[in-house]
Design a protein with these regions (language model features):
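Intrinsically disordered, compositionally biased charged tails
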Residues: 1-27
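Structured, basic alpha/beta domains of bacterial-type, RNA-associated proteins
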Residues: 19-35, 41-92, 97, 101-131
């Protein structure tokens, strides 16, 4: 009986290690999908300078209003990665506000795939929650 209790309460070390490893493709990029309202974004993150592109344009050109660019930069700013990572993304559906929210959600999820230790900070800020 003691062996049965011990087996039930034992955690496999492989399960723990797997959740702390980054999920990167062959090119060293982390990928995630973000959603808000009816907008859907696909986001890739890799090491590089502060460059955020949306549908092939710099984010400042795609979003004319500064508030939208600020919204999608929030996860990078919160995790001190604003000047360290490049973000490539596509977004479709909905309006500009929904698209900015979908990008923030996608960037947050990609950051967790890139560095799983950031999950707690992003979750606390509410960036990983889909609405």
């Amino acid at each position: 009986m003691n062996e049965k209790v011990l087996k039930e309460n034992t955690i496999e070390t492989e399960d723990i290690a797997e959740s702390t490893l980054p999920k990167l493709d062959k090119l060293g990029r982390a990928y995630a999908t973000g959603r808000r309202k009816t907008s859907v974004s696909r986001v890739w993150i890799k090491h590089g300078s502060n460059k955020i592109s949306v549908n092939g344009k710099p984010s400042k050109d795609y979003f004319k209003r500064k508030i939208y660019s600020t919204i999608l930069e929030e996860p990078l700013f919160k995790t001190d990665n604003l000047d360290k990572l490049e973000v490539f993304s596509t977004v479709s559906g909905g309006g500009l506000s929904g698209q900015a929210g979908a990008l923030r959600h996608g960037i947050s999820r990609a950051l967790v795939n890139f560095d799983p230790s950031l999950r707690k900070k992003l979750k606390k800020a509410g960036f990983l929650t889909r609405d």
